[in-house]
Amino acid sequence: MDFTYSEEQQMLADSLRRFVASEYTFEKRRRNAREHGAFDRRIWSALAEMGVLGLGIPAEHGGFGEGPASQVVVQRELGRALVQEPVIPGAVIAGAVLSHYAPAALQSQWLPAIASGERVFALAYLEAATRYRLDAAQASATPSANHGYVIDGVKSTVWHGGAADMYLVSAKLDGALALFLVQRDAPGVSVTPYPTIDRLAGADLALDKTPATLVTADGLAALEFGIDHGIAAQCAAAAGAMERLIEITAEYLGARKQFGKPLASFQALQHRMAEMLMHNELALSMAYVAAQGLDAADPEERRRKVSAAKVITARAARFVGQQAVQLHGGMGMTDELEVGDYFKALTMTDVLLGDTDLHMERYCGAMAA
């Protein structure tokens, strides 16, 4: 598989790397988290100006219409810096769902707002009893004479839900899963944000006869499509984070001395670093496999490639994160080193957008189809 960037992709990667080197140093990332939580409006606007938020949105709606391969380039750079803003749920997932499943009027209304950074979207599909099952939603939607539809239910672990002002919400409509748009300031909306272990944020979303706009009655297909785009982006971001963590670890082993020699000179540690690099390369390869799957005409092929990428990337992320902590010794357990931030982010790779058990089952189902 050829990972060579096109000229435009290389320019985009270079500009993003310069941006995060300036705005996302370890100290600035920690300060932003303290002052702004997991969302800094200034950074969000800058990402919009650089074309990150509109990358996959059609040009007629203010975006650039780039394909999944370009998204891998972008997410790899954002992952290297552990960028905290909700690019994946707010732009990648929401943009994919609205671009392919929303009626033309909703596309014209909301896609330009995503590309410009004017609106921040979040995906509210998980519930306490669903265990990642997309079609097991207990939230329900009913027609309303005044508002089109109203939704009742509670959504949990909404990724970046506290920063969002718009929600894509799954709910049962006439017994089938549908997807709706809900505005944060709509009547009956209650948002309870909380921090997650990776210094990001989740939220619980309670809806009590909340007015909603129908995006599509084919909610299961739309939800799967959007989440698969999010997983491909997540795999690329994890590969970028692993890449940077390996660099940090190599720098530490080169500087730290034991028995009068740098730790990097010990062959056993060199072998462990080589294993970390192999896992990182495998994860990057699988990010491109997932990106290829997004273009597949057959949904089963898409499911197979995306779920395989998710499982392998999650395993690689855990391995690289754990090895980095161990190679840093006792310092790896402290909060003062950025290795801990990378470890936490990589650990979350397994549980975001479906865990390994779910995707192993999904992969096997796609293989049998």
Where are these regions (language model features)?
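Short glycine/proline-enriched turns and hinge-like loops at secondary-structure junctions
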Residues: E66-G67, R133-D135, H160-A164
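A short, Trp-centered hydrophobic/proline-enriched beta-strand micro-motif
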Residues: G117-A128
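Short, conserved beta-strand segments within well-ordered enzyme catalytic domains
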Residues: L53-I57, V73-Q75, A122-A124, L168, ...
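Alpha-helical interface subdomain recognition
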Residues: M1-L82, Y101-L106, A113, G117, ...
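A short core secondary-structure module
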Residues: A124, G148, D152-V189
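Flexible, small-/acidic-enriched active-site or ligand-binding loops
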Residues: Y132, A136, T157-V158, Q183-L214
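N-terminal glycine-rich flavin-associated loop
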Residues: E85-A105
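A structural signal for short hydrophobic beta-strand segments in well-ordered beta-sheet cores
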Residues: A139-T142
